[in-house]
Amino acid sequence: DGGAYGSYGVASLYYTGALQTVTYDVPTYRFRGARAFTNKPPGGPKRGHGTTQPRFAVEVHLDKIAEELQLDPAELRLRHLVKPNAVTANWLQLGTVGLAACIEKVVEGSRWKERFRKLPYGRGLGLACSSYITGAGLPIYWNDMPHSGAQIKCDRGGGVTIFCGSTDIGQGSESVLA
């Protein structure tokens, strides 16, 4: 649903398909999508930009698989994570992937092994993952232009200033650059 105008509907749909391969190892992949014009306001890039709804569907499906097979959902995810420096089925070049360490830290900090499937009726403990490819690697929009850049200015007093086109909208880009 891209709304009544062209806007970013096609780009969001592109991200929906392109970025589903960057969390879990998917050796073969096919995506078909359609962008529909509706009488709603135009959609555009906000947090997640085309990835949140399909990622939610994948994560719910993984939970259903784990439940049916009586597997630990955290271990199922860890077993199928994409590896660092991998090239995905749709030719996205990945660099560092810190998701395994993140899951392990969450499992430890939440006392997952002690509490999962052991809480009273109406209480639960869950886990879901997502990834987003950023920075280096192949650009999402294929062209020969640089797809990210920054300038660093060092002054005589030891100060450092970073100039870049990054806008922090809750995704932590200012913290990363600091």
Where in this protein do the model-derived segments appear?
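Short coil/turn segments at secondary-structure boundaries
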Residues: 92, 116-122
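N-terminal leader/propeptide and maturation segments of large enzyme subunits in energy/redox metabolism
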Residues: 45-113
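Gly/Pro-rich active-site capping loops and adjacent beta-alpha segments
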Residues: 1-54, 120-178
